[in-house]
């Protein structure tokens, strides 16, 4: 499972991205408001067949998957994260950003506390696509009680989780008094549950992080 339900405003007119097997694909951004009025601006990719329904400043609802791809930026390898659109729907009047995902912990989770005392755990989920041999490696972040419990998960653990795909702006220090504006894209988790072999939910190992949801939405 790898599904995102996203609705919001189209920031700009879609632009040609790539062509494969005779089919053209286009990319653009959707801005989606949280309840806190903060905005996540997410890159989306769609096939040409949807193009005539995508107009700048229109509100729209889409269903798709979170996709990732490595690319070279000079000598560095970076991760491209975007929403691959599979369905278009009429805007329902409220912005939405909800993700359901199952996958495997593929790195050692990193637990830390911010200067303001917030507990955070960063980790990466490998989600296998339905086509054989391809996976998407999705950065994820957990907060509070969820942060502590996810920090204890072992590499290879199969989990189901839900949350929001967020864009987070930050400043990276590149010199003594010099900073670079950057944007991180990550799955902000509000619930997760361990899965048994075959994808069956394990009732003994689940964490509902809804007690942290208000902080998650205002973060």
Question: What function would you assign to each model-found segment?
Answer:
Residues 1-7, 13-24, 33-41, 49-52, ...:
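Acidic, gly/ser/pro-rich intrinsically disordered tails
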Residues 45:
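A positively charged, amphipathic N-terminal helix/segment that binds anionic biomolecules
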Residues 58-71, 157-170:
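Flexible glycine-rich surface loops and low-complexity tracts that mediate binding to linear polymers
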Residues 59, 63-92:
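Short, structured interface segments
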């Amino acid at each position: 499972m790898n599904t995102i339900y996203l609705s919001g405003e189209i920031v700009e007119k879609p632009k040609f991205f790539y062509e494969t097997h005779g089919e053209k694909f286009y990319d653009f951004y959707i801005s989606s408001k949280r309840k806190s009025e903060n905005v996540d601006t997410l890159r989306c990719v769609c096939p040409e067949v949807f193009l005539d329904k995508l107009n700048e400043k229109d509100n729209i609802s889409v269903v798709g998957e979170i996709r990732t791809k490595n690319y070279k930026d000079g000598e560095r390898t970076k991760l491209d994260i975007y929403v691959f659109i599979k369905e278009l729907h009429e805007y329902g009047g409220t912005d939405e950003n909800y993700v359901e995902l199952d996958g495997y912990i593929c790195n050692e989770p990193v637990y830390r506390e911010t200067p303001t005392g917030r507990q955070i755990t960063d980790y990466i989920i490998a989600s296998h696509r339905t086509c054989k041999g391809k996976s998407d490696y999705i950065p994820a972040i957990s907060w509070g009680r969820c942060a502590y419990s996810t920090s204890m998960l072992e590499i290879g653990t199969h989990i189901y989780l839900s949350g929001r795909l967020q864009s987070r702006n930050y400043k990276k220090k590149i010199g003594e008094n010099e900073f670079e504006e950057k944007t991180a894209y990550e799955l902000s988790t509000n619930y997760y549950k361990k899965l048994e072999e075959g994808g069956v939910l394990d009732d003994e190992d689940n964490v509902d992080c809804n007690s942290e949801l208000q902080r998650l939405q205002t973060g």
